[in-house]
């Protein structure tokens, strides 16, 4: 039976996370492993409301939004080449990677 590796990616920038997911998929496919994904997970949006004025005018407010994007990649492999390829892979600093075997 093949070993299952689950990789979760998180980022505030969707372009960065898509490029990182593509790098991972390409590196794993070069080792002849089976890849499922990248699967887009629901994005989380946080909205922050602040007063524009430091003293009065409570009706005047400004809203800021912070979106967190997530992707899921499942890898099915028997070889150690796949794990070595993942360890040597360099990803941008704006992407959080969590790996479960």
From Swiss-Prot:
One Pfam family named in its UniProt record: Ribosomal_S10
Keywords: Ribonucleoprotein, Ribosomal protein
GO biological process entries: translation
GO CC annotations on file: ribonucleoprotein complex; ribosome
Gene3D superfamilies xrefs: Ribosomal protein S10 domain
Single Gene Ontology MF annotation: tRNA binding
Entries under InterPro entries matching the protein: Ribosomal_uS10, Ribosomal_uS10_dom, Ribosomal_uS10_dom_sf
Family to which the UniProt record says this protein belongs: Belongs to the universal ribosomal protein uS10 family.
Oligomeric form and interacting partners: Part of the 30S ribosomal subunit.
Xref: NCBIfam families: PRK00596.1 (NF001861), rpsJ_bact (TIGR01049)
Function summary: Involved in the binding of tRNA to the ribosomes.
Full protein name: Small ribosomal subunit protein uS10
Species name: Amoebophilus asiaticus (strain 5a2)
Lineage: Bacteria, Pseudomonadati, Bacteroidota, Cytophagia, Cytophagales
Gene: rpsJ
């Amino acid at each position: 039976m093949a070993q299952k590796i689950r990789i979760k990616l998180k980022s505030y920038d969707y372009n960065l996370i898509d490029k990182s997911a593509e790098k991972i998929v390409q590196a794993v496919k070069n080792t002849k492993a089976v890849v499922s994904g990248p699967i887009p997970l629901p994005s989380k949006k946080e909205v922050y409301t602040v007063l524009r004025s430091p003293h009065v005018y409570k009706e005047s407010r400004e809203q800021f939004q912070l979106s967190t994007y997530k992707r899921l990649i499942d890898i099915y492999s028997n070889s150690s080449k796949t794990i070595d390829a993942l360890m040597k892979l360099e990803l941008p600093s704006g992407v959080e990677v969590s790996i479960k075997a």
